[in-house]
């Protein structure tokens, strides 16, 4: 009789402990980690993306009206440098090192609007205006892909930045 009680007690204890062990199982994290990582300096962003990100130099067209807001790496390969102007418009400048046969790659993040080809200097640049009025451009130079997106920005300011600063810099330094 004593053996039956020991056996019953052992079965009961096991039944009580099984849910305890099962509840300690680790649950996998839900969702995916963000591919966006912010950096504090240009050099940290360049190192993280193994590239030389295109940027808006101080003292150019919008001197004193343009403020750097973010250095962001996207997926560890694409840099996104963001600016805010005094008038509330914003500018995003992206750079990615091309791998293999990625020439002509659109890294702007803009996939609506009608893209048109135009020559700026010796570079073919694809430009578009979206339904919300944002202006976008992308092009490649050497082993790099570039894009610039302006939101709430006049066509004249965007075009001047694109031709006089960004495409010009990419033709001379990349």
Feature locations, PLM:
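Amphipathic alpha-helical interaction segments
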Residues: 13, 50, 91, 123, ...
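Noncatalytic linker/hinge segments flanking ATPase motor cores
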Residues: 135-137, 167-168
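Surface-exposed amphipathic alpha-helical segments
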Residues: 142-144, 148-174
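Generic hydrophobic/packing signal
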Residues: 24, 123-125, 162-166
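Sec-dependent N-terminal signal peptides of Gram-positive bacterial secreted proteins and lipoproteins
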Residues: 1-24
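Short, solvent-exposed recognition patches
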Residues: 26-135, 141
């Amino acid at each position: 009789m004593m053996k039956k009680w020991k056996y019953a007690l052992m079965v009961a204890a096991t039944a009580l402990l099984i849910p305890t062990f099962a509840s300690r199982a680790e649950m996998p994290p839900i969702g995916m980690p963000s591919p966006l990582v912010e950096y504090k300096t240009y050099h940290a962003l360049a190192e993280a993306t193994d590239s030389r990100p295109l940027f808006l130099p101080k003292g150019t067209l919008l001197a004193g009206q343009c403020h750097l807001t973010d250095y962001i790496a996207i997926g560890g390969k694409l840099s996104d440098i963001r600016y805010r102007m005094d008038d509330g418009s914003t500018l995003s400048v992206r750079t990615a090192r091309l791998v293999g046969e990625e020439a002509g790659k659109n890294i702007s993040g803009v996939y609506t609007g009608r893209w048109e080809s135009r020559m700026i200097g010796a570079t073919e640049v694809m430009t578009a205006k979206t339904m919300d009025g944002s202006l976008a451009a992308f092009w490649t130079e050497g082993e790099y892909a570039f894009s610039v997106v302006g939101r709430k920005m006049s066509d004249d300011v965007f075009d001047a930045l694109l031709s006089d600063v960004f495409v010009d810099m990419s033709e001379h330094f990349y």
